[in-house]
Amino acid sequence: MWCMRRLPTNSVMTVARKRKQTTIEDFFGTKKSTNEAPNKKGKSGATFMTITNGAAIKTETKAVAKEANTDKYPANSNAKDVYSKNLSSNLRTLLSLELETIDDSWFPHLMDEFKKPYFVKLKQFVTKEQADHTVFPPAKDIYSWTRLTPFNKVKVVIIGQDPYHNFNQAHGLAFSVKPPTPAPPSLKNIYKELKQEYPDFVEDNKVGDLTHWASQGVLLLNTSLTVRAHNANSHSKHGWETFTKRVVQLLIQDREADGKSLVFLLWGNNAIKLVESLLGSTSVGSGSKYPNIMVMKSVHPSPLSASRGFFGTNHFKMINDWLYNTRGEKMIDWSVVPGTSLREVQEANARLESESKDP
């Protein structure tokens, strides 16, 4: 069972706008906060490392016009409280789920999206769907990814499509299912690949909960965050894709600014196109020194495509080798069965901790 925590809210706030957009205050007539900080233009053009079926290539990001607000909230202030006070009662009610369940580390980065017309329409649609139909995941779990993987802890991003649409499956994490639901077909193939890469990985298809990954900094993000029961893709093209693309963009902008590691593990064309629309298409380059963003691509682990390039990629191990050997950071323990672990990962992480304690 998850526990919602309130984290400090002095996170860096990043906002990207090419032009002034109409916000919901224009609809409801609410006053804009006088505390709004001016935007500061950010830079793009960083390089990153791309792995496609095991081949490393250096890639230049395309220059993307964007603005980054690097001002922080004043110490001891609460972003949600400040934000909520400047909303109309109607909008406050509509955004109650965002205010109550999005982790404090994410909220300052995302809050500008909530006032945009597309998001208001999206919330109106989802609210009506929840009133008229069964919608997955349960409301409290729609943003569980923010609580399980705080913004500044994200190291790896895995992008899915829409949530599982049967009972006791979706809980806000892509590819993951609630216990005791067994692993779906795509996740079974993920386990098969992990077993090839790490022989001591315990492959148990009765287990489908990937919360252990999320708690280590693996963001499991679906591009659509809700779905009507037994109706796949029923909530796609209603605004979630715009929102989750912004989530990815904010992570890229933040990591470009602070140099922290970020890995994209992209399975299938939808995930690849989303990230390439922000980072640019890959192009062959040269050089032995790679900066802080790595992109790894393959076909989707679905039974329909896994045999055409998912198996044998060695991506999970390559991610760990890059984090540990190149970035000097802890590896991800990809184990899923409670009480099990990957020996190689545990030993490497123990060495790293020991080295950090040495004078």
From Swiss-Prot:
Q: Which residues make up the transit peptide?
A: 1-21
GO biological process entries: base-excision repair, AP site formation via deaminated base removal; DNA repair
**Presence of the UniProt keyword Lipid biosynthesis in the record:** no
User: SUPFAM superfamilies given for it?
Assistant: Uracil-DNA glycosylase-like (SSF52141)
Q: From the UniProt record, list the reaction(s) this protein catalyses.
A: Hydrolyzes single-stranded DNA or mismatched double-stranded DNA and polynucleotides, releasing free uracil
Key word ATP-binding present: no
Query: One GO cellular component from the entry?
Result: mitochondrion
Disulphide bonds in the chain = none
| Chain ranges passing through the membrane | none
Q: Where is the signal peptide?
A: none
Please give the record's induction comment.
Answer: Induced in late G1 and early S phase of the cell cycle.
Q: Where does the record place it?
A: Mitochondrion; Nucleus
Q: Which GO terms describe its molecular function?
A: uracil DNA N-glycosylase activity
Cross-referenced InterPro entries: UDG_fam1, Ura-DNA_Glyclase_AS, Uracil-DNA_glycosylase-like, Uracil-DNA_glycosylase-like_sf
Q: What is the pH-activity profile? A: Optimum pH is 7.5-8.
Q: Where is the active site?
A: 162 (proton acceptor)
Question: What is an example of a Pfam family matching this protein?
Answer: UDG
- Tell me which EC number(s) this protein carries: 3.2.2.27
Task: Could you list this entry's UniProt keywords, alphabetically sorted.
Answer: DNA damage, DNA repair, Hydrolase, Mitochondrion, Nucleus, Transit peptide
Q: Which family does it belong to?
A: Belongs to the uracil-DNA glycosylase (UDG) superfamily. UNG family.
Q: Please, what other remarks does the record include? A: Present with 4820 molecules/cell in log phase SD medium.
Q: Which NCBIfam families match?
A: PRK05254.1-1, PRK05254.1-2, PRK05254.1-5, ung
PANTHER family in the record: URACIL-DNA GLYCOSYLASE
Purpose: Excises uracil residues from the DNA which can arise as a result of misincorporation of dUMP residues by DNA polymerase or due to deamination of cytosine. Not involved in strand-directed mismatch repair.
Name used for this protein in its record: Uracil-DNA glycosylase
Q: Record the organism.
A: Saccharomyces cerevisiae (strain ATCC 204508 / S288c) (Baker's yeast)
